[in-house]
Regions:
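Alpha-helical scaffold segments in soluble metabolic enzymes
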Residues: 3, 12, 36, 48-52, ...
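Hydrophobic residues embedded in beta-strands of well-ordered beta-sheets
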Residues: 9-11, 64, 77, 220
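Rossmann-like nucleotide/phosphate-binding core characteristic of flavoprotein oxidoreductases
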Residues: 105-225
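Generic secondary-structure signature for well-ordered alpha-helical cores
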Residues: 6, 18, 39, 43, ...
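A Rossmann-like FAD-binding core segment of flavoenzymes
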Residues: 1-48, 163-170, 174-181, 185-194
Length: 225
């Protein structure tokens, strides 16, 4: 939309084609009569509680950085839904909330078991937290967005923490045709079979198995080719 037409009321909008830099192309203008314009842009997650808790935030999404179990940088605090990153559909939020709840419950059960096994049981929150999560203390794998990939959720992976690692991402601008490729060093661990169009308004999803991550050491990179 390059112009809204009307004085006291909306009468029409002018739309234009854009180039690869999202700049309107002169001569492509088209007038579409209408009486209402709805805008849903620039949504930002609300994370005052996250900041107060000392949780590390992703500067791109403005939401918490999480691992593949949706656990934040603060042990025992999990994040999901639009507080984590803006979603396309409520169904996506619901599924992510179910996943976060499952992982949080597993964490709580592990904490309880660790405390029961400890001869010196403590009711101190910080001491209790230190006893949790030991079974998930694998080396973390960084998830790095490259090229047209603007961000990823999660930003880090504990390979053995979940049976399947769900990687979600958005592109920074429209890409007419490309494939998703995920690499570890020189090795391609995932590449989509078919090329397709990518747009920033649609969240993309890739599932990686534990077998695909088995030989990864430090990081994986997510890009389009």
């Amino acid at each position: 939309v390059t112009k809204i037409v009307g004085s006291k009321r909306v009468q029409a909008v002018e739309v234009s084609a854009v180039d690869e830099n999202l700049k309107p192309i002169p001569g492509t203008e088209e007038i579409i009569p209408c009486d209402t314009v709805l805008l849903s842009i620039g949504l930002i997650p609300e994370n005052e509680l996250s900041k107060k808790a000392g949780i590390e935030l992703n500067p791109v999404t403005n939401g918490p950085k999480v691992d593949n179990a949706l656990e934040t940088s603060v042990k025992g605090i999990f994040a999901c839904g639009n507080v984590l990153h803006v979603h396309d559909l409520v169904d996506q939020v619901t599924k992510e909330a179910e996943d976060a709840g499952t992982y949080a419950a597993e964490y709580a059960a592990e904490c309880a078991a660790a405390q029961q096994a400890d001869a010196a049981v403590s009711t101190d929150v910080e001491t209790a937290a230190e006893a949790c999560g030991t079974s998930n203390a694998e080396t973390e794998i960084a998830v790095i967005p490259e090229g047209m990939v603007r961000y990823t959720v999660p930003t880090r992976i504990c390979a053995n923490r979940t049976p399947v690692t769900k990687i979600k991402f958005r592109v920074g601008r429209p890409v007419e045709t490309a494939k998703i490729r995920i690499t570890s060093g020189d090795k391609v661990i995932f590449e989509s079979k078919k090329a397709k169009k990518f747009v920033p308004s649609i969240m993309e999803n890739v599932n990686l198995t534990a077998a695909q991550l088995a030989d990864v050491q430090d990081e994986i990179k997510v890009t389009l080719v």
